[in-house]
């Protein structure tokens, strides 16, 4: 396990492995070794990488950014609300930091994806053991070819940036992944640590700002969508207008033929 020379605002180490079963599993191991809040493990390849609902994550070795952040909160009541969505916001902002030409084209799809030009560029998986939180992130950075069904649904940053557009320093090479990682960590720190500091100092509700900023880049907001509540294979569907997200990150839909919003905590937003 190699220690990377990256600036981590959490003040914790960033480790790198060429190949792991999954960065999520390695992060759990590191938690057991008493690594601190904000420790990161990144890898060139995951042999058993997975996303939400145990879906596989198709990636070429060394082309994309794969990492997990270990966050220690002591007890579950201290975990920031809507952490997956707030991570999505951080990732989307970092992508625009990296590739300014994509500003306005990067959106967050409820509950855990980041879309670039209406195609999936990143996925987020958040797990907890009650005390520790593990945020797994996968971002398509330099991959240009995706297998099978992913070909029309996925996109990488290098594919999305227009020819001739300016990149942030270090982009379009192997170091781009780690440059993006550093930017994501800074954005994530701003989303989940700085608001707590401001709230404690000013007695303000820090959650208002993240929600408002997220709503402005919410994928399919204001459009007619199909939502599958609960399990992804459920035969129950809700059609209606996607009106936004609630204070805790819940999905808000105005069902077809109704006038009032309904809130959903989990389920699948069908957009393909």
Per-range role (PLM):
Residues 1-101:
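N-terminal lobe of the biotin/lipoate ligase/transferase fold
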Residues 9-10, 32, 74-105, 116-272:
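Long, positively charged amphipathic alpha-helical accessory segments at protein N-termini or as interdomain linkers
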């Amino acid at each position: 396990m190699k220690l990377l020379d990256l600036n981590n605002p959490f003040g914790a180490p960033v480790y790198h492995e060429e190949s792991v079963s999954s960065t999520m599993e390695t992060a759990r191991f590191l938690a057991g070794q008493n690594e601190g809040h904000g420790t990161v493990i990144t890898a060139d390849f995951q042999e058993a990488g997975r996303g939400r609902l145990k879906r596989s994550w198709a990636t070429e070795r060394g082309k994309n950014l794969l990492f997990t952040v270990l966050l220690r909160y002591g007890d579950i009541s201290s975990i920031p609300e809507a952490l997956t969505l707030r991570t999505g916001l951080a990732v989307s902002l970092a992508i625009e930091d990296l590739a300014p030409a994509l500003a306005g084209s990067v959106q967050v799809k409820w509950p855990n994806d980041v879309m670039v030009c209406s195609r999936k560029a990143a996925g987020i998986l958040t797990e907890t053991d009650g005390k520790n939180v593990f945020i797994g992130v996968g971002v398509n950075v330099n991959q240009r070819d995706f297998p099978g069904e992913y070909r029309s649904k996925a996109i990488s940053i290098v594919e999305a940036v227009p020819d001739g557009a300016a990149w942030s320093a270090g982009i379009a090479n192997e170091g781009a992944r780690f440059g993006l990682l550093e930017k994501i960590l800074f954005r994530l720190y701003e989303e989940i640590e700085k608001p707590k500091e401001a709230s404690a100092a000013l007695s303000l509700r820090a959650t208002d700002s993240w929600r408002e900023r997220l709503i402005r880049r919410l994928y399919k907001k204001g459009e007619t969508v199909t939502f599958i509540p609960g399990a992804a294979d459920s035969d129950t569907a809700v059609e209606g207008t996607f009106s936004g997200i609630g204070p805790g990150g819940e999905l808000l839909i105005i069902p077809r033929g109704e006038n009032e919003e309904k809130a959903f905590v989990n389920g699948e937003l069908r957009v393909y």
